[in-house]
Structure formats: C-alpha cells, structure tokens
C-alpha cells in the first residue's frame, strides 16, 4: 500500500507529509485537520478506483476546476483551497497533483491487482441510523453522508444473519433492537 499524501496550506493543514500503511491512525486535537486529511485520502482513492475502471478519463478531472467543484465539494472542503495550496497524492496506480490552481493526474502503468474500497465515514454518521427514513433531513447533510447512509443500509442487509469475523472465533450480528 504505502501511499503518500503531501498537503500544504489546505484548510487547517499547513504542512503535512504522510505515508499511509495498511492501518493509519490519526490522533490530535479537534480542528487540526484529521478529518480533512481522511477526506482527501478517501477522495483520491475513489478517483483512483474510477479511473482504473475506465469510468472516467484523466482529462475529466483535470478540466473545468473539477478538483474543487466536484471532488472537494463532495466532502464540503472546497473552501479549504487557498491560492498557495499544494496537494500531492502518490497512489498505487496514479499520482495526483494540485498546484497553482491546476489539477493533474499521471498514470503509473502498473498492473491492477484489486483496489480496496475506501470510504470516509462522516461525523454525521450517528444521524444516519436515526434518520434512515427521513429523506428530507438526510438531504441537508453532506453528500458523503448520503453515500454512508446507502452503505449502512446495504451492510445491515448483508449482515442480517450474522458474520464470522476472521479471528478468535468471534461472530458479528446486527440486532435492530439495540
């Protein structure tokens, strides 16, 4: 995995250079950019996935300021972009660079051996389970909350009869009464 994210002057993040391992844990005070970095990572992993699946061309994301108006706007972080913002993500299959107001994508020409599913779980996650059938309330939340809500409903259906976890003989079961 060992993907790398470099961020300068983006929202609360002044200067960051992080290498993502199989498990990466963010610890810090509130408002220091943990969620911002998680949203960027999730966004780049999603973009890498759809590009590798040929659902979009590289040029789609590079044109018309879509980095800001589509990708960042999805997580409501478009206002975090400043004139001097610099963001570089070195993924497994693509490199992404935002610099001087321009966004570019470079393909690495590597074999695809499976792309993991990464999703940012929004802070509004607790509202999703309570407001599952209240579509008007959910529409006021960020788009990432709607995606999380859809995945939450699918997971409940999938795990309805339980799931054996891959360690210590543990089993997960969802009980809607708890």
Identify the meaning behind each predicted range.
Residues 47-178:
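Phosphate-coordinating catalytic segments in nucleotide- and nucleic-acid-processing enzymes
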Residues 1-42:
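Pre-Walker A-like glycine/lysine-rich segment at the N-terminus of P-loop NTPase domains
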